[in-house]
Amino acid sequence: MSFRRALSLACGFAGGSAVLVCAAVVADKNGYFGEGRRVTETLAAVNAAHPPAWPTANGWDYNWDKREPSSMVNGKRKESTGENGSQDAENNKPRATRHIFLIRHSQYNLKGDGDKERFLTPLGREQAEFTGQRLASFGLKYDTLIHSSMTRATETANIISKYLPGVELVSCDLLREGAPIEPVPPVTHWKPEAVQYHEDGARIEAAFRRYIHRADAKQKEDSYEIIVCHANVIRYFVCRALQFPPEGWLRLGLNNGSITWLTVRPSGRVSLRALGDSGFMPPDKLTRT
């Protein structure tokens, strides 16, 4: 293979690595490389231009929610009957998709001494109206509206529910705001005590396991669920669901009243259809408190 032909082939693979390829051409012109070495050096330079793959030990974990069908087969029953468990696995196989809308509460009174005094501001109530209208505009049949038991999340959920008549409202203490895991890199403006990570982290992880998982095998139709909670909780949920390093949660930003849309397929695959969408609000109504 001639050097020019090899270089042409390398260009096809390289995409945006034109600078490195041009450097190899100059080297060839000046006779710095032998024919065989020129090809090797060029391809090596092209490969070096590509970003390294993120190091993962096992790739995607399809049993991340401990609901992969084959993992739910009763081992003792399998041994006693001599069956291969394939029928049980088939019976446990989900067939529906879960759509989970994670809503951050609206702007609230930051000067309140406790939760009861940290109610929504007039702007926050207006933001919740926009969010409710946006969710209603999708034309979806929502199954439930779950919300954190904290005042600002409860008030946000109550306003949203006006636009979704007939959707059940459910309060949950597990969804309360907290410190899920120590963020990396650390920040100077927010440093909870270690005990707070210990207490909040276990609770928020429990909330994740309760609400973020593939559908039950008995579920026949796709579901659409709304969860109104807090920025830290939502960001942690997103990192966990996508199998990103969970300690990176604080690198994400969410506006008040924004919509984050997670989809969990029967196979266990998870996709993020929207992160912190607040484009349905006028620019002068956007806040991040």
Swiss-Prot record:
| Recorded catalytic activity of this chain's protein | O-phospho-L-seryl-[protein] + H2O = L-seryl-[protein] + phosphate; O-phospho-L-threonyl-[protein] + H2O = L-threonyl-[protein] + phosphate
Q: Does the keyword Membrane apply?
A: yes
Per the record, GO CC terms? mitochondrial outer membrane; mitochondrion
Which Pfam families does UniProt cross-reference here?
His_Phos_1 (PF00300)
Give an example GO molecular function: protein serine/threonine phosphatase activity
Matching InterPro entries: His_Pase_superF_clade-1 (IPR013078), His_PPase_superfam (IPR029033), Mito_Ser/Thr_phosphatase (IPR051021)
The protein's UniProt keywords, in alphabetical order, are: Hydrolase, Membrane, Mitochondrion, Mitochondrion outer membrane, Necrosis, Transmembrane, Transmembrane helix
EC number(s) recorded for this UniProt protein: 3.1.3.16
Record's bilayer topology term = Single-pass membrane protein
The question of whether Oxidoreductase is a record keyword is answered with: no
Q: Which GO terms describe its biological process?
A: positive regulation of mitochondrial fission; programmed cell death
What Gene3D superfamilies does this protein map onto?
Phosphoglycerate mutase-like
| PTM characteristics | Phosphorylated by the RIPK1/RIPK3 complex under necrotic conditions. This phosphorylation increases PGAM5 phosphatase activity.
Q: Which intervals of the chain are annotated as region Disordered?
A: 68-96
Query: Where does it live in the cell?
Result: Mitochondrion outer membrane
- Output the superkingdom of the source species: Eukaryota
Membrane-crossing segments per the record? 5-27
Q: Supply the enzyme class, top level.
A: hydrolase
Q: Where does the protein principally reside?
A: mitochondrion
Protein family per UniProt: Belongs to the phosphoglycerate mutase family. BPG-dependent PGAM subfamily.
Q: What is known of its domains?
A: The N-terminal 35 amino acids, including the potential transmembrane alpha-helix, function as a non-cleaved mitochondrial targeting sequence that targets the protein to the cytosolic side of the outer mitochondrial membrane.
Functional description taken from the UniProt entry: Displays phosphatase activity for serine/threonine residues. Has apparently no phosphoglycerate mutase activity. May be regulator of mitochondrial dynamics. May be a central mediator for programmed necrosis.
Descriptive protein name: Serine/threonine-protein phosphatase PGAM5, mitochondrial
Q: Which organism is it from?
A: Danio rerio (Zebrafish)
